[in-house]
Amino acid sequence: MSGRRPIGTLFWYGTTVFLSSAFLLVLEIVAGRLLAPYVGVSLYTWTSIIGVILAGLSLGNWLGGRIADRGAGEVAVGVTLAVAAAACFAILALLMLVARPLQAMELSLLKTSFVYVAALFFLPAVLLGVVTPLLTTLALRLDVRTGRVVGRMHALAALGSITGTFTTGYWLVQTVGSKTIIIATAIALVLLALPYLRDFRFKGGAALGVIVVIVALVSVTRLVQGFVNPCLKESGYYCLRVVDQFGDEGEARSLVLDHLTHSTNIKHPPDRLMVPYVHAMDELVHHHYPDPRVLRYFFAGGGAYTHPRAVQYRYPNATVTVSELDPVVTEVATSELFFDPRNIRILHGDARVVLSSLADQEFDAVVTDVFHDIAIPYHLTTKEYHQLVKTRLAPHGLYLINVVDVFPDPRLVKAMIKTLAAEFRYVDVWVDHAPSAPTRLTYVVSATNGQPAPNRLRARRGEPRTWYNITDILAATGTKLSDLPALSDDFAPIERLISTLFFSEAGR
């Protein structure tokens, strides 16, 4: 670029800083989606992603300054961008090569997510971090106004980061998919590098080396199926997959959100509930209401629509309202999971916002099934949300919640008992078995101002299951309820309460 006028060169330097910063944030946002099928999405996952990429960026900034002080020119910028493109493209192959051994290791979820991010995204972050200080130094050779040049470059880097964040999060992920974004970013980095490599002397060996690297990257990625997208659909919230199930039950399909099977739908009969916690919720409603044929249901969370589908099939005169955050989930349930949305009112939006908008509605049963794996929307665990539910319930209505927590000392479940007890007379916790070793477990919590629950609940239909009321056992063992907080909008330390799931093998 030596033939350009200084103003044009400075403009191109600024554009490169803007774009390289944007690409780094594109990778950061995509990292969360790319890793979701393996480690899910949680505060700790995002902490690993942000921390590793910032560490790489910091190291890259330091290296860029050192390289610039040694007199590096535009060719160094081009080489850095080209190597960054290769590192970016290699993410797809590395993911598949790292996934199998890492998933087989007995590491905590926190360690696993950190290793994934470090292996895949640290090097691209370092390389892209080199660009800004290197180009800032080159710009200062053309414009001696240090403050203006440095300020402009920092501003462009920040604006690029903002643009990359919003473009990826709001549009790219749900439009083209995460793996396509990775490939497009690598190609864009190559194109960005080319003008800086104009003066680079490609000797025969160097040109051959570049070709070999490109062929090797593409071949390895194809060999390990790195180009294959594991998601049937990618939305703004989930990587969605549908898995066919074969067994004595007949044709069945399961919905997988990120890395966890959410629920399983049997084609016929629709009211056969295979997932134990969904079955438990259904049986609790039937125990509470001897004649459930005309009940008014509100479901917070649709997912595979397993429970709403069963209710509507069994009781056509029941009123069923479902709040589902993600329209793509509803689309997949309708097209792939035997769900017929007719006669069910579906409101797409956050469950708390939707329920708040139904001020003139009253429900006999409110079923909250939104706690996906360990990604728990804290605002649906607080006393303010429970108070809202209470205002929408019939006087003796039933409130049901499923919660993923550790066994045998589920501190989040206990905190929810304490929080719910301030609003409801009877609060009970249900499990279908007691594991022999510490592990993760799905609990069902019921709350009502109506009748007390039994100590044991036998299934009246479907699989021959029994659920046990362990409320008193939880209160008498492990962490005391008095040592746990009542959850509120102001203070709901969900991640701390379920930290055992992140820091031990029980969370895997």
Regions of interest found by a model, annotated:
Residues 264-288:
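Class I SAM-dependent methyltransferase Rossmann-like catalytic core
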Residues 1-234, 244-251, 259-264, 286, ...:
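Alpha-helical transmembrane segments of multi-pass membrane proteins
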Residues 445, 449-508:
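SAM/dcSAM-binding transferase cores
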Residues 330-331:
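Short alpha-helix immediately C-terminal to the canonical SAM-binding loop
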Residues 334-344:
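Short, conserved SAM-binding/catalytic segment
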Residues 354:
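Short acidic active-site motifs
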Residues 250-253, 262-266, 454-456, 482-484:
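Short, solvent-exposed loop/turn elements at domain surfaces
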Residues 268-269, 377-380, 411:
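Short, solvent-exposed loop/turn segments at secondary-structure boundaries
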